[in-house]
Amino acid sequence: MKSSIVAKLEALQERREEVEVLLGDPGVISDQIRFRALSKEYAQLSDVTRCFQHWWQVQEDIHTAEHLLQDPEMRDMAQEELLASGASLEQLEQQLQVLLLPRDPDDERGCFLEVRAGTGGDEAALFAGDLFRMYSRYAETRRWKVEIVSASYGEHGGFKEVIAKVSHEGAYGLLKFESGGHRVQRVPETESQGRIHTSACTVAVMPEIPEAELPEINAGDLRIDTFRSSGAGGQHVNTTDSAIRITHLPTGLVVECQDERSQHKNKAKALAVLGARLRAAEVQRRQQEESSTRRNLLGSGDRSDRIRTYNFPQGRVTDHRIGLTLYRLDEVIEGKLDMLIQPIMQEYQADQLAALSETP
């Protein structure tokens, strides 16, 4: 293992000892926010240091076995020990490199999930409804809470656009790979001649950011309109102008919220979504600058960034980023997304490891 990696691991071991002392400090214990943050850091550092200590032990075992090779009576046993320890050392080094990969601090957060119908008219809106149902089913299996923040319904079902808040620690870390263009190929129910139509939707996943970390938004940059809430088919579901539409004038971003009966609550939700969008745009801009020479498995959320195709006649789903094709569309559309998400996460991790190995 490279000396630079060993140095990083030794520094983390020292940091773990520091955090352990801090966790016993009465001043830290009385500050619950700091205590929770340090407890979380301690748990993460403990995973690394346990693995590192095991690595050192295996190194010592190898050194002892090499010494025993000089003894004719112990040579066979020493050779067996060297083979076993060598394999163990290689595995531990891989584990340590994975543990050293930079963590996205947003991964442990909840998220906002946005699904927009693209090209394809009514069929695109129906597909947006299918995608939202797919994500809702996935959330159900993990016992996540999904709450619609804003919805614009299609004339014949589905959604023109739907924004939902997914409340659970770690939701963003799993769903962030869903951002991008999703394409569907199927025969619409209204198609009498059995022709396959192609429609598209865009999915954007943004971390839910605590209010203290949201970008500062100048009130003068906002145009706030109120209107009457409406449901599917356009019928009004409220007799007061409680729905809110916020336009961020510098960027043109528009967020609507009509889920609550209270105008104040709708405004708070809309501002939270707007803040998340603005922050996501800034993070994406930075990532593009930093990784211009490396492929990015994290979709941008742009319509042109097609990440996946769902072909219903063939029962096939293809993720274009990693060239993965599964003939299990029925299961995927019912929310069994781990068979897609896990391979993408593994590929993403492999890319990060490749980048780590290139650093001096």
UniProtKB/Swiss-Prot annotation:
- Record localization: Cytoplasm
Xref: Gene3D superfamilies = 3.30.160.20, 3.30.70.1660, 6.10.140.1950
Residue ranges under compositional bias (Basic and acidic residues)? 284-293
Query: Any one cellular component term from GO for this entry?
Result: cytoplasm
DNA-binding as UniProt keyword? no
SUPFAM superfamilies cross-referenced by the UniProt entry: Release factor
Q: State the residue spans of region: Disordered.
A: 284-311
Which GO MF terms does the UniProt record name? Answer: translation release factor activity, codon specific
What keywords does the record list, in alphabetical order?
Cytoplasm, Methylation, Protein biosynthesis
Which residues form each disulfide bond in the chain?
A: none
- What modifications follow translation? Methylated by PrmC. Methylation increases the termination efficiency of RF1.
- N5-methylglutamine carried by residues: 235
Family statement: Belongs to the prokaryotic/mitochondrial release factor family.
Function of the protein: Peptide chain release factor 1 directs the termination of translation in response to the peptide chain termination codons UAG and UAA.
The protein, known as: Peptide chain release factor 1
Q: Which organism is it from?
A: Sodalis glossinidius (strain morsitans)
